[in-house]
Amino acid sequence: MKADIHPAYETIEVTCSCGNKFETRSNLCKPLGTDVCNECHPFYTGKQKTLDTGGRVQRFADRFGAFGKKPAATPAE
């Protein structure tokens, strides 16, 4: 590597919106704020929400399932 062409690589403090703080190294050289971290992200905390895609599909089928079908033939007199 060439000398004196690379940015400074220093330890910075990262602060999450939940209040968790940790240190990492970066060339940003100033404190960093983030929205989620491993302490508050739903994937890591186990508080994931599952989407009800089956209910949405069923609701669509209820509304538009008969669309395009021919009406039942009535018996001729």
Swiss-Prot record:
One of its GO terms (cellular component) is ribonucleoprotein complex. Pfam families: Ribosomal_L31. GO terms for molecular function: metal ion binding; rRNA binding; structural constituent of ribosome. Zn(2+) binds at residues 16, 18, 37, 40. Gene3D superfamilies: Ribosomal protein L31. Its cofactor is Zn(2+). Binds 1 zinc ion per subunit. PROSITE patterns: RIBOSOMAL_L31 (PS01143). The keyword Ribosomal protein applies. GO terms for biological process: translation. Keywords: Metal-binding, Ribonucleoprotein, Ribosomal protein, RNA-binding, rRNA-binding, Zinc. It comes from the Bacteria. InterPro entries: Ribosomal_bL28/bL31-like_sf, Ribosomal_bL31, Ribosomal_bL31_A, Ribosomal_bL31_sf. Belongs to the bacterial ribosomal protein bL31 family. Type A subfamily. Part of the 50S ribosomal subunit. Binds the 23S rRNA. This is Large ribosomal subunit protein bL31.
